[in-house]
């Protein structure tokens, strides 16, 4: 159904909604995998695993050195989650964002407000969010221009964050 890769581990969502995990298990990101089924999406951070169940609740397991697990938002209605180096960001069904984990570059505290977001991606220590009008919000670490060099204007269809870079796909298929 879906696969996700962290720095040294991977997840796969099976057709029955259960999660398979393999790779490095330095912080329980593999061995902590919930046994139940009912998950609809998976994501990985550096040493963190994340999954959303059918109600929109987030499950997280693995590295908790910066609150990546213990500060995971509760409740339902989450439609997407993405993990970075030591932080995560989630998109709620109302189009708003929630971030948690390490905040040494503003990747949590600078999360933009609003309810017009449609897609997210956590990079190493920064995050990106695509708005319904095709514009991009970027926040967090900017050591390599991964935030400041974010293109202005609309026309974007997807965003992705790497450790020290960001990439965006335009609606016309160009990058």
Name these PLM-found stretches.
Residues 6-8, 15, 26, 45-46, ...:
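Short loop/turn segments that connect beta-strands within the blades of beta-propeller domains
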Residues 1-2, 15-20, 37-41, 54-59, ...:
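Tandem repeat domain/solenoid detector
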Residues 9-12, 21, 48-51, 60, ...:
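Conserved core positions of repeat-based scaffolds
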Residues 8-9, 23-35, 62-74, 101-113, ...:
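Short glycine/serine- and acidic-residue-enriched loop/turn motifs that recur at repeat junctions
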